[in-house]
A protein has these predicted regions:
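Charged active-site motifs of nucleotide-sugar-dependent glycosyltransferases
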Residues: 151-159, 190-191
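Active-site and donor-binding regions of nucleotide-sugar-utilizing enzymes
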Residues: 1-146, 160-173, 182, 186-187
Length: 194
């Protein structure tokens, strides 16, 4: 089996032959997207050309719907099996996307069990696979420690959620930390969770 694509260090360590560096897609916000749009469109075309050249048996895309679902739609005419992992949050907004992607995807892998119904209703073969964090070896231990701390009625708890993309974390985390320090000066009974 040969695996070509766009991925990070973990996928590269498993033998992925990269088309380009995934860091180019790690962007946040409309302004950053607009600045990098010409590069993103070039990478989209490059990826499609590579798929045409390689003639794969299957194309599997992971998350990044702005890039990957456009790619999947653009290669529909190639008659290659298409699977996407991490459904767009159609249950939260833009529910029409479920119908849209059912026209070009062959199968969808979803993180949450309630997501299935939105896509099955549109005729898209869908499988619930679970969230990867649930398979983390340290997950149970971390949950236990968090639950133990959350049960402390004297503490106020605040979650700091800077995002998952490096760009988001770099921009938001310093602001979150500054806010946490300011709050901690006045309120000693606060515990922050990241």
């Amino acid at each position: 089996i040969e695996i070509f694509g766009v991925g990070g260090s973990k996928m590269l360590s498993q033998g992925l032959k990269p088309i380009f560096n995934i860091k180019f897609l790690s962007i946040m916000g409309i302004f950053e997207v607009l600045l990098k749009l010409p590069k993103i469109l070039k990478l989209l075309k490059l990826t499609k050309r590579k798929i045409i050249e390689i003639k794969p048996d299957i194309v599997i895309t992971i998350d990044a719907p702005g890039f990957n679902l456009r790619l999947q739609k653009s290669i529909k005419s190639l008659n290659v099996k298409q699977i996407h992992y991490v459904a767009p949050s159609v249950w939260a907004w833009k529910s029409y996307r479920a119908k849209k992607i059912s026209k070009f995807l062959d199968h969808l892998l979803v993180l949450f069990p309630f997501e299935k119904k939105f896509f099955i209703k549109e005729g898209l073969s869908t499988t619930f696979v679970g969230h990867p964090i649930a398979f983390d070896d340290n997950f149970d231990k971390n949950i236990y420690n968090v639950e133990k701390s959350l049960n402390d009625k004297l503490l106020k708890k605040i979650a700091l959620l800077p995002g998952s993309r490096l760009g988001e974390i770099k921009k938001l985390m310093p602001v979150f930390i500054k806010a946490a320090h300011l709050l901690n000066k006045d309120y000693k009974s606060i515990k922050f969770y990241i």
